[in-house]
Amino acid sequence: MDYVIGGGLAAFIIYAAKKWNKTEKEKIQHTFQNIGYVVKDKEPKLFKTHKSTTHTLYTYHVPYGLVDDPKLEVLEKVLNKPVKVSFANGKLHIKVYHSKLNNNYSYDSFESKGKWIVPIGKTYDGSVYHDFDDIPHMIVAGSTTWGKTVFLRMLMTHLIENNPNGVEFYILDLKGRLAFNRYRNLKQVKAIAGDYKESANALKKVKKSIDKDMDYLRSIDAENAKEANIPTRKFIIIDEAGELKPDKSMSDEDKEYTKKCQQILNHIARVAGQIGYKMIYGTQYPTKEILDPQIKANALARVSFRLATSVQSGVAVDQPGAEKLECKGRAIYKTVDDYIVQTPFISKKEIWERIGRYENDPSSKEDQKTRKNTVHFG
Ligand SMILES: Nc1ncnc2c1ncn2[C@@H]1O[C@H](COP(=O)(O)OP(=O)(O)OP(=O)(O)O)[C@@H](O)[C@H]1O
Ligand SMILES: [Mg+2]
């Protein structure tokens, strides 16, 4: 008698796989029961399934009283795929993405979309960009080494490449001027400050420039930079705003400088956005003391890399989640909507290949003229 070894076993494996490998739809339905996302014996009923290249969208009729519940976050672990749950038009929508985000997307995989539009990152649905002419001020939060400085440098590189003659930077590089020192030689960088006194001086220059621009706008009866056809945009970048918090160890003089800085930064946040001044406020410590309410209320774009606690996440992006971000460069980008993004990675080498030609470029006449007015502190 001949035996075919394995034949019966193969049939059993296929049978068992069918039995135990439940479909996504079945797993979701079981999860509803197991976590008690039901009303008495009534549970959500699948109403429509829509498949696309990036995701499958399941839409459910739910019993009255059920909405998008944080309990449903477990679906991400149950399905081992990224899941977005929302509740709209009386229905529950569960979007299950086919794959997770990569841990690295190179900067050159993003397009150039316009003068003041910068790439923010890849989401599950594609790339996301930010328009600084729509939303002028941005807070960039994140604990140490999760990606703030790479992100700030990437923004600068993009803005310089797109507007070599129309963008200006004032940089407060408050961790000893280590992150942006080389940028001082760029023609677009008008001031770079590494301590309190230099920061106060740099911001006083910005304040003077704002006053002048305001006078000009009033004289032509224009309300904003676009209406007045002002081509230049001025970016004030703060890399570690936490350093500007006055504390007991500071000299009285330094306390005064930090107060002056805070005062001018508040002024920029409140009045200067629409006249062409954009503030990018970076901090490791998003606490109520460091994120002044005026600045928070006016910085309507937020980018948060990983933070230590959900409380910090609440301060930075008004919602928990930043404490759970998994890898370097991963962030929550929030304006009206919020997205999980993997921000573009750019190396120092690539940055200087792209913008190195604007370092100490004495060949252009316009360049020489601007550089005369350029103030380098320290
Ligand atoms: N978008 C990104 N994609 C992949 N890796 C990244 C990304 N951004 C940063 N990294 C990695 O994380 C490291 C630290 O990043 P970065 O210097 O920007 O941190 P940081 O938040 O500024 O830290 P600190 O607060 O200490 O200054 C980088 O050297 C790089 O290896
Ligand atoms: Mg840094």
Which stretches of residues belong to each language-model region?
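P-loop NTPase catalytic phosphate-binding loop
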Residues: 1-23, 57, 103, 107-219, ...
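N-terminal "pre-motor" subdomain/linker immediately upstream of P-loop NTPase catalytic cores
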Residues: 5-6, 10, 15-112, 116-121, ...
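Short, glycine/acidic-rich hinge or "gate" loops at secondary-structure transitions
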Residues: 218-227
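Short basic/glycine-enriched coil/helix segment immediately N-terminal to the Walker B
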Residues: 226-234
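Surface-exposed substrate-engagement region within the catalytic domains
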Residues: 312
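Conserved C-terminal "switch" segment of AAA+ ATPases
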Residues: 320-336
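Extracellular glycan-recognition surfaces and repeat-rich motifs
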Residues: 341
